[in-house]
Amino acid sequence: MINKIGVLTSGGDAPGMNAAIRGVTRYAIQKGLTVEGIIRGYEGLLSHETRPLGRRDVGAIIHRGGTMLRTARCLEFKKKETQKKAVAYLRELEIDALVVIGGDGSMRGAQALSRLGFPTITIPGTIDNDMMGTQYTLGFDTTVNTVLESVNKILDKIGRA
């Protein structure tokens, strides 16, 4: 039975990550679960940087850029021993399942945890839109539209040719 979940963002940040954190947290609380936010992704997991997340913590984050949990890349996480340490710490925190939001490297990390028997679910979040199994990743559409809007503003400013 799942009573407590962890949520982390890893790799490069992408628009929509805060909305995903908010959605995961609110849904979990609605279902009676406790949520632990892991700061700075897998790097923070290894250095034991966590904080409980409640409704108030995620209430006003939906329109902020980046990720409230911050993010980092963690080359150390490619090692099996490091992955085992991460699972041990998750169990020490009494986290029953982990939600990972990020790109391809984040997904590989989540897959490694899953192979070690730790329940993990992923939300693809990358501006690159280069993930198999999904047509659009979290952050891609916003990024494309922001670039398009910026280009149009520049063209308007200089006078369209």
Each language-model region and where it sits:
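N-terminal phosphate-binding or glycine-rich loops at protein starts, especially the Walker A/P-loop
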Residues: 1-46
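Short beta-strand segments
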Residues: 8-9, 38-39, 70, 100-102, ...
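Gly/Ser/Thr-rich loops at beta-strand to alpha-helix junctions
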Residues: 11-15, 101-108
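Short Gly/Thr/Asp-enriched flexible loops that form oxyanion-binding sites at enzyme active sites
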Residues: 19-24, 105-118
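Short, acidic/small-residue loops that bind anionic groups at enzyme active sites
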Residues: 36-39, 114-137, 141-144, 148
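Glycine-rich oxoanion-binding loops at beta->alpha junctions
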Residues: 45-100, 105, 137-152
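Conserved small/polar residues in nucleotide/adenosyl-binding loops
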Residues: 161
